[in-house]
Design a protein with these regions (language model features):
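Extended, charge-rich alpha-helical interface modules
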Residues: 1-81
């Protein structure tokens, strides 16, 4: 996946996240399934942003950016900022 594909995936995930959040704010149903989907979207976004950062760092330091890999949710969710 190249940077453009990662960014397209991020845009798609963000759009879905916004749609779900807007439905909740408008008083729409707030089911366990929707909350679970929001959590999945947040995790997938964290993974995508991490992948994009990896790719950009590899490129900056002259390494092959295509060697960047999606890391497990458990790993990216526990980063200290």
């Amino acid at each position: 996946m190249d940077d453009h594909q990662v960014l397209a995936q991020i845009s798609s995930l963000v759009a879905e996240e916004h749609e779900l959040r807007e439905q909740r704010q408008a008083g729409g149903p707030d089911s366990a399934d929707e909350r679970a989907r929001l959590a999945q979207l947040e995790q997938a976004l964290d993974q995508c942003w991490d992948l994009l950062r990896q790719r950009r760092a590899r490129k900056e330091f002259g390494q092959d950016e295509s060697d960047a890999m999606v890391r497990p949710v458990e790993e990216v969710e526990n980063y200290l900022q």
